[in-house]
Amino acid sequence: MIEVCPENVRIEESWKKVLYEQFSQDYFVRIKETLLAAKAQGIVTYPPNKLIFNAFDQTPFDAVKAVIIGQDPYHGRGQAMGLSFSVPKGVRPPPSLLNIYKELKRSYPDFQVPDHGDLSAWAKQGVLLLNASLTVEAGKAGSHRAIGWQEFTHAAIEALSNEREHIVFMLWGNFAKAKAQFIDAEKHCILTAVHPSPLAGGAFIGCDHFRRANDYLIAHGKTPINWQV
């Protein structure tokens, strides 16, 4: 069994402090073993190692104003960048993201639908774009859902719930809605809707989450998110 030295985990410093105890847990060791075994066998995983903790690196703990939870990274080549629903510039925006843009256009008529899917601008404003599983095997959706990432992201959500206040949690689809149990609804705003995927029948359009999130932030003395990317 390998060991994980918490000091050597490359993640943004404020998150390292908050999640420090998680890095020595058995489940975290299991994650590292799984990724090392995949590499040894020539199995490709996404995102690249340097982007696994990109959501945390882009949005420090004390900067988080909103959280958008995804299931796991995109499993196609060049898509995953460590931010839920986001793809790098130059990669065609996936259908779920196009529906997110449609809802933004409905809520904010001045919103200009971009020709890219890079949501880094949201992350820099305090939107934690968190996938519940932080890695995936190429071409196999959900393949790393049971290797330990769930425990890690549960810990991150609980830390935000317990140590911060007035954060907007946007939970889309049944998988994300299950995370509500880790969030104190008296301290935070929990918004739920169907998943933005076209497979959900388009019912995501009209949820008004982006406007409601900003209304909540403004009501609690915070700068609203500029959703334009």
Curated annotation (Swiss-Prot):
Domain of life, source organism: Bacteria
Catalytic activity: Hydrolyzes single-stranded DNA or mismatched double-stranded DNA and polynucleotides, releasing free uracil
EC numbers, comma separated: 3.2.2.27
InterPro entries xrefs: UDG_fam1, Ura-DNA_Glyclase_AS, Uracil-DNA_glycosylase-like, Uracil-DNA_glycosylase-like_sf
Location in the cell: Cytoplasm
NCBIfam families according to UniProt: PRK05254.1-1 (NF003588), PRK05254.1-2 (NF003589), PRK05254.1-4 (NF003591), PRK05254.1-5 (NF003592), ung (TIGR00628)
Functional summary from the UniProt entry: Excises uracil residues from the DNA which can arise as a result of misincorporation of dUMP residues by DNA polymerase or due to deamination of cytosine.
Assigned protein family: Belongs to the uracil-DNA glycosylase (UDG) superfamily. UNG family.
Protein name in the entry: Uracil-DNA glycosylase
Native species: Dichelobacter nodosus (strain VCS1703A)
Gene that produces this protein: ung
